[in-house]
Swiss-Prot record:
It comes from Desulforamulus reducens (strain ATCC BAA-1160 / DSM 100696 / MI-1) (Desulfotomaculum reducens). The gene is rnpA. The lineage of its organism: Bacteria, Bacillati, Bacillota, Clostridia, Eubacteriales. This is Ribonuclease P protein component. It catalyses: Endonucleolytic cleavage of RNA, removing 5'-extranucleotides from tRNA precursor. It comes from the Bacteria. Belongs to the RnpA family. It is an enzyme of class 3 (hydrolase). Consists of a catalytic RNA component (M1 or rnpB) and a protein subunit. One of its GO terms (biological process) is tRNA 5'-leader removal. RNaseP catalyzes the removal of the 5'-leader sequence from pre-tRNA to produce the mature 5'-terminus. It can also cleave other RNA substrates such as 4.5S RNA. The protein component plays an auxiliary but essential role in vivo by binding to the 5'-leader sequence and broadening the substrate specificity of the ribozyme. GO terms for cellular component: ribonuclease P complex. GO terms for molecular function: 3'-tRNA processing endoribonuclease activity; ribonuclease P activity; tRNA binding. Keywords: Endonuclease, Hydrolase, Nuclease, RNA-binding, tRNA processing.
């Protein structure tokens, strides 16, 4: 099983935001940016507007687990950043999974065009 690696540095997040491709729906925004041989890395950004710390951490844990569970579906040597929108605060695991794949499909369509 491959290792789950998180983005930590602010400069890495800025590169993904500036040069990456994005897709969004009501609940999530997903950025994808190819990195040069650094492997598959994930970052999560959840604003304080989403809710209190308990809510934000629950959403981060849900997304992290979804990414870990479906690790083989994500491209190698790419950075992914998920931005959780305020409307996601009451979503459960299965709903977030559905929203994640919806955004993933939009991103793949956008890349093909």
């Amino acid at each position: 099983m491959k290792k789950f690696v998180s983005l930590k540095k602010n400069s890495d997040f800025r590169n993904v935001y500036r040069f990456g491709v994005s897709a969004a729906n009501r609940y999530l925004v997903l950025y994808k940016f190819p990195n040069k041989g650094l492997g598959r890395r994930f970052g999560f950004s959840i604003s304080k507007k989403v809710g209190k710390a308990v809510c934000r951490n629950r959403l981060r844990r849900i997304l992290k687990e979804l990414c870990r569970f479906h690790l083989d579906r994500f491209s190698d040597d790419c950075d992914f950043v998920f931005i959780v929108r305020q409307t996601s605060s009451d979503q459960d695991f299965h709903q977030m999974e559905k929203h994640m794949w919806h955004v993933w499909g939009k991103l793949n369509k956008q890349e093909k065009n």
